[in-house]
Swiss-Prot record:
<feature type="binding site">
    <location>
        <begin position="206"/>
        <end position="207"/>
    </location>
    <ligand>
        <name>1-deoxy-D-xylulose 5-phosphate</name>
    </ligand>
</feature>
<comment type="function">
    <text>Catalyzes the rearrangement of 1-deoxy-D-xylulose 5-phosphate (DXP) to produce the thiazole phosphate moiety of thiamine. Sulfur is provided by the thiocarboxylate moiety of the carrier protein ThiS. In vitro, sulfur can be provided by H(2)S.</text>
</comment>
<keyword id="KW-0704">Schiff base</keyword>
<protein>
    <recommendedName>
        <fullName>Thiazole synthase</fullName>
        <ecNumber>2.8.1.10</ecNumber>
    </recommendedName>
</protein>
<dbReference type="InterPro" id="IPR033983">
    <property type="entry name" value="Thiazole_synthase_ThiG"/>
</dbReference>
<feature type="binding site">
    <location>
        <begin position="184"/>
        <end position="185"/>
    </location>
    <ligand>
        <name>1-deoxy-D-xylulose 5-phosphate</name>
    </ligand>
</feature>
<feature type="binding site">
    <location>
        <position position="157"/>
    </location>
    <ligand>
        <name>1-deoxy-D-xylulose 5-phosphate</name>
    </ligand>
</feature>
<comment type="subunit">
    <text>Homotetramer. Forms heterodimers with either ThiH or ThiS.</text>
</comment>
<dbReference type="Pfam" id="PF05690">
    <property type="entry name" value="ThiG"/>
</dbReference>
<dbReference type="GO" id="GO:0009229">
    <property type="term" value="P:thiamine diphosphate biosynthetic process"/>
</dbReference>
<keyword id="KW-0963">Cytoplasm</keyword>
<keyword id="KW-0784">Thiamine biosynthesis</keyword>
<comment type="pathway">
    <text>Cofactor biosynthesis; thiamine diphosphate biosynthesis.</text>
</comment>
<dbReference type="GO" id="GO:0005737">
    <property type="term" value="C:cytoplasm"/>
</dbReference>
<keyword id="KW-0808">Transferase</keyword>
<feature type="active site" description="Schiff-base intermediate with DXP">
    <location>
        <position position="96"/>
    </location>
</feature>
<comment type="similarity">
    <text>Belongs to the ThiG family.</text>
</comment>
Length: 260
């Protein structure tokens, strides 16, 4: 079972709460996904008013753990300030830390990310950093005190799936004691299964479910994909080969097939 800081869960699927056709569909999709952790944006909910209260009521009804994020922040100062506001609003020291460097790719500002993570951890936060698949960046985040690291599969909302499989595998091999979550870029349940097959502890996604023709059915499909991927990893996947290997044994071949 995946462990996030001092809390253990059963689901390996974390899910976002944005972009759904309606609040009711959001609730149904989250239930169908089996997710126990949902991400929420402070910027969305801090807008205040009745809409924010109604959204928070829907989330409470789901009986899930809330992971606030700093989505949209483009500087260390902005991310740190947003994280502190989120702690006050949601009553949790958990924060999904995002510091964005580029508006087109939404690529993380890895230098600012490490700096912000260091500041927040010293202030008592438990940080879930959204980063690239770069090993040196992940290592710096771990050295700063992060016990969870969340590398992307591909740019947010791209639905491309895992672009750099070798780099993600290297992260898993080099950080065996860190909870690793593939975050962003997953577009199909098979992408989630692939991440879990690599030994990742969980995946986080939003758009692939929220923008599906049937978000509830897609959420269920991702749940099954995660289950399949983790089961395959635990069962032990065979190594890929460059050449064919017969699956039918030669022993017991009928005599008329024997070569003279």
């Amino acid at each position: 079972m995946p462990t996030f800081y001092d809390k253990t869960f059963t689901s390996r699927l974390l899910i976002g709460t944005a972009l759904y056709p309606s609040p009711a569909i959001m609730q149904d999709a989250i239930r169908a996904s089996g997710a126990e952790i949902v991400t929420v944006s402070l910027r969305r909910e801090a807008a205040g008013g009745k809409s924010g209260d109604a959204f928070w009521k829907l989330i409470r009804e789901l009986n899930v753990t809330v992971l606030p994020n700093t989505a949209g922040c483009r500087s260390v100062r902005e991310a740190v300030t947003t994280a502190k506001l989120a702690r006050e609003l949601f009553g949790t020291s958990w924060i999904k830390l995002e510091v964005i460097a580029d508006n087109d790719t939404l690529q993380p500002d890895v230098v600012g990310l490490v700096e912000a993570a260091t500041i927040l951890i010293k202030d008592g936060f438990e940080v879930f950093p959204y980063c690239t698949e770069d090993l040196s960046v992940a290592t710096r985040l771990v050295d700063a005190g992060c016990k969870v690291v969340m590398p992307w599969a591909a740019p947010i909302g791209s639905a491309k799936g895992i672009i750099n499989r070798d780099a993600l595998k290297l992260l898993r091999d080099r950080l065996p004691d860190i909870t690793l979550v593939v975050d962003a870029g997953l577009g199909a349940p098979s992408h989630a299964a692939e991440a879990l097959e690599l030994g990742y502890d969980a995946v986080l996604l939003n758009t692939a479910v929220a923008k599906a023709a049937d978000p509830v059915a897609m959420a269920r499909a991702f749940r099954l994909g995660c289950d399949a991927g983790r089961t395959a990893y635990e069962a032990g996947l065979m190594d890929a080969r460059d050449f064919a290997s017969p699956s039918t044994p030669v022993v017991g071949t009928p005599f008329w097939h024997a070569v003279s």
